[in-house]
């Protein structure tokens, strides 16, 4: 794949996303500000998937014919490219159907007595944060229920960041799970500090990186986390593909989550021995074309340069926070400054329900998310039923931020001002 870009040539980038040219039902061109929920795909990703399907589609790791060989090569080459994009080794990556499955895989293994992640004596503690997406909370609730452990969590400060003073860890803690970027407040976690605290008590760390991998340079080896998860559809890639990263020495001793074909060494009627990692964790027919598409997305972002992506998105977020903060009656849920802040910008408007904000913006062709964003405990922390959320990607413009602010003003005039 070739992509010719000057430093963040927005015209060239936007030309790669045909959907951005769409005129919506209100007669306005689409301003897509919902990439935190799912991102749009560039033609390079669509073309990579299509090229694979029309030329090399075959069963991976099975048989000896040419299509099988080409499919297997494409699948494993994709693993190499994706691993390089996040600062990991290829044999440390497991493909799943989404980040939720990746996090469930890890939590399931922690409850398996073949893995020495927990003691199983009922005295273990599992730690997460009040900021979490349900995908990084409910699996740990279930693990605590299954093994009789206690679930504890870091609280949240009034500006939507992890409150490091709210919890002290001890040797009973076995796992600390947290998000790199909050999908609601946009707060960036102090990853190295949390990893250091976990290591002091012998706990393992699990990072939900869904909101960070598409938006900034991420080096998982450099961060020092033990596990990490992210989804393809949030980083310009296909639906139906997620990634689990695990340190090699952990992955090599972890028992499987799902069992069946493709993940075995030998099978008898009495017992089974399993393939080495990562194949041990990829039971059944894999999502080959989606891996090809996700690898194309990683190459696309890498060609632009993740530092340039991060700088561009910081400009957009700063403009959104500043513009919304100037509106009387609008409250940002999250940090007001750009220090330790990611892409999502969530807000509420006095006297106007979030769904009404979303409807007015939709009439203007501006797509945002409204609701609790799969983070009910966090919304309860702020005594809110719902927020509106704008979230940005490399293809967004300052003009689209201006349209967001104008739409909120229009909604406030219509619903909230006498």
Swiss-Prot record:
Keywords: Pyridoxal phosphate, Transferase. Its EC number is 2.8.1.7. InterPro entries: Aminotrans_V_dom, Aminotrans_V_PyrdxlP_BS, Cys_dSase_SufS, PyrdxlP-dep_Trfase, PyrdxlP-dep_Trfase_major, PyrdxlP-dep_Trfase_small. Its cofactor is pyridoxal 5'-phosphate. SUPFAM superfamilies: PLP-dependent transferases. The modification N6-(pyridoxal phosphate)lysine is found at residue 234. GO terms for molecular function: cysteine desulfurase activity; pyridoxal phosphate binding. It holds the Pfam family Aminotran_5. It is an enzyme of class 2 (transferase). The keyword Transferase applies. GO terms for biological process: cysteine metabolic process. The active site is at residue 374. The keyword rRNA-binding does not apply. It comes from the Bacteria. It catalyses: (sulfur carrier)-H + L-cysteine = (sulfur carrier)-SH + L-alanine. PANTHER family: CYSTEINE DESULFURASE (PTHR43586), CYSTEINE DESULFURASE 1, CHLOROPLASTIC (PTHR43586:SF8). Belongs to the class-V pyridoxal-phosphate-dependent aminotransferase family. Csd subfamily. Catalyzes the removal of elemental sulfur and selenium atoms from L-cysteine, L-cystine, L-selenocysteine, and L-selenocystine to produce L-alanine. This is Probable cysteine desulfurase 2. The gene is csd2.
């Amino acid at each position: 794949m070739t992509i010719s870009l000057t430093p963040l040539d927005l015209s060239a980038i936007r030309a790669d996303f045909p959907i951005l040219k769409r005129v919506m039902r209100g007669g306005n061109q689409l301003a897509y500000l919902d990439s935190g929920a799912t991102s749009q795909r560039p033609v390079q990703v669509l073309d990579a998937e299509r090229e694979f399907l029309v030329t090399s589609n075959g069963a991976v790791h099975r048989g000896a014919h040419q299509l099988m060989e080409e499919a297997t090569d494409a699948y494993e080459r994709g693993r190499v490219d994706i691993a390089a994009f996040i600062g990991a080794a290829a044999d440390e990556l497991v493909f799943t159907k989404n980040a939720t499955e990746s996090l469930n895989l890890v939590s399931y293994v922690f409850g398996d007595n073949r893995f020495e992640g927990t003691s199983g004596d009922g005295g273990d503690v599992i730690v997460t944060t009040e900021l979490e997406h349900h995908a990084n909370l409910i699996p740990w609730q279930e693990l605590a229920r299954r093994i009789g452990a206690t679930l504890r969590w870091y609280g949240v400060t009034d500006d939507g960041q992890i409150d490091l003073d709210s919890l002290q860890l001890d040797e009973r803690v076995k796992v600390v799970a947290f998000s790199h970027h909050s999908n609601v407040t946009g707060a960036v976690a102090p990853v190295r500090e949390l990893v250091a605290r976990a290591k002091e008590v012998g706990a393992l760390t699990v990072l939900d990186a869904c909101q960070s991998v598409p938006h900034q340079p991420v080096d998982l080896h450099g961060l020092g986390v033990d596990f990490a998860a992210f989804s393809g559809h949030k980083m310009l890639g296909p639906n139906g593909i997620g990634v689990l990263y695990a340190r090699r020495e952990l992955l090599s001793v972890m028992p499987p989550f799902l069992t069946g074909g493709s993940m075995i060494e030998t099978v008898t009627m009495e017992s089974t021995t399993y393939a080495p990692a990562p194949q041990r964790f990829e039971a059944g027919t894999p999502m080959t074309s989606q891996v090809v598409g996700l690898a194309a997305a990683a190459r696309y972002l890498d060609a632009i340069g993740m530092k340039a992506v991060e700088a561009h998105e910081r400009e957009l977020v700063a403009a959104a926070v500043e513009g919304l903060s100037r509106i009387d009656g609008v409250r940002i849920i999250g940090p007001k400054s750009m220090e330790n802040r990611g892409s999502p910008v969530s807000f509420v408007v006095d006297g106007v329900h979030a769904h009404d904000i979303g409807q007015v913006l939709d009439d203007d062709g501006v797509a945002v998310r409204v609701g609790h964003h799969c983070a009910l405990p966090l919304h309860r922390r702020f005594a809110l039923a719902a927020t509106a959320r704008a979230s940005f990607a490399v293809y967004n413009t300052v003009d689209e931020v201006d349209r967001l602010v104008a739409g909120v003003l229009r909604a406030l005039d219509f619903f909230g001002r006498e």
